[in-house]
Regions:
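Conserved "landmark" site that anchors the functional core of diverse proteins
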Residues: 1-195
């Protein structure tokens, strides 16, 4: 079995995957909403029409991600207020940090914290760093940040405790767009230096 499931209230099922990469490929025609987590998928459904067991039986683990995942190239100005701190903690130069950050390919594992805030895996292990001891009251939209094993881009102005290494003018969240979040789970992201 590749996943286990649990009822999540009367109108949802939580799938837990032994292989977290499979969560991007989970589809269900009976689900009204699919929410991807770090190793789970939440399927919300119409409880008046379906039972938990019906929804679970309709889950398919096809190659859905391969056909829908997008690739994004994000231009970044590497001038974040925590850039030197992250380089120092990583025991590499700022130039080396930028080189490593732009050579990696990241995958959007899941979204959370704020609309359009994608947790990107693929960060060089040397650059894994703790969050700030004291969060900032306001992090500007477009801030490129790292914390723990993840990289992210703040899609809107918000409070935040991640280490800021750069900024982008790319729009990551547009509530008027058909898909408001630019980067969605399963998508890949690469960063390039603004010259």
């Amino acid at each position: 079995m590749t996943h286990t499931w649990h009822p999540y209230g009367s109108d949802a099922v939580l799938l837990e995957f032994t292989d977290p990469h499979q969560r991007w490929a989970a589809t269900c025609p009976l689900a009204d909403e699919v929410v991807v987590g770090a190793s789970t998928v939440l399927l919300r459904f119409d409880a008046r029409r379906y039972r938990h067991e019906h929804v679970v039986a309709a889950v398919s683990l096809g190659s859905h991600v391969a056909s829908t995942a997008a690739e994004h190239v994000i231009p970044v100005t590497y001038d974040g207020p925590d850039l030197a701190v992250v380089a120092d903690r990583s025991e590499i130069s700022i130039a080396e940090l930028i080189r490593r950050h732009t050579e990696a390919t990241y995958r959007a594992e899941f979204c959370g914290f704020a609309p359009g805030f994608a947790y990107l895996s693929g960060l060089d292990p040397a650059m894994h760093t703790a969050r700030r001891a004291s969060p900032r009251a306001r992090v500007p939209r477009g801030s490129v940040a790292v914390a723990g094993p993840y990289c992210a881009i703040y899609p809107t102005d918000s409070p935040g405790g991640w280490q800021l290494i750069g900024r982008t003018e790319a729009v990551l969240f547009d509530p008027a767009a058909p898909y408001p979040a630019t980067v969605r789970p399963g998508d890949t992201v690469r960063f390039e230096v603004v010259r």
